[in-house]
Regions:
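Conserved ATP-binding/catalytic core of the eukaryotic-like protein kinase fold
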Residues: 4, 12, 45, 61-102
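Juxta-kinase regulatory segment immediately upstream of eukaryotic protein kinase catalytic domains
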Residues: 53-62
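N-terminal anchoring/assembly modules that precede and organize ATP-driven motor systems
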Residues: 1-50
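Proline- and acidic/polar-enriched loop/turn elements at helix boundaries
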Residues: 24-25, 56-57, 89
Length: 102
């Protein structure tokens, strides 16, 4: 499934990963600006504005999976027989934690 640049920006904003305003400022600082969702995702990951996992999930239309309560999923740390472990950040306190999902 290919999504447009506008859809990608909208989903990044809706998922809480990065605001549309911040993306617009980022795009203005790029020469030339990204013209596709894939290119923008690569640039954002390269500049550490989003993680590779975040860009992939949003690109796949699964950005809603990045929010778990007050936590924003940043990256996958590991997986095992009982579930997955993610690096996450509390959205208000900005504290990083390991979250295990079963």
């Amino acid at each position: 499934m290919t999504i447009t640049l506008e859809q990608f920006i909208s989903q990044l904003d809706e998922s809480g990963v990065i605001s549309a305003v911040d993306i617009a400022a980022f795009q203005e600082s790029q020469s030339p600006p990204a013209e596709s969702a894939e290119d923008l995702g690569k640039l954002l990951v390269k500049q550490k504005k989003v993680t590779k996992l975040q860009a992939q999930l949003v690109y796949q239309g699964k950005g809603n999976r990045l929010l778990l309560g007050n936590y924003l999923i940043l990256d996958k740390i590991g997986a095992g027989g009982m579930g997955d472990v993610y690096l996450a950040e509390h959205r208000r306190m900005e504290r990083r934690v390991a979250l295990k999902t079963l």
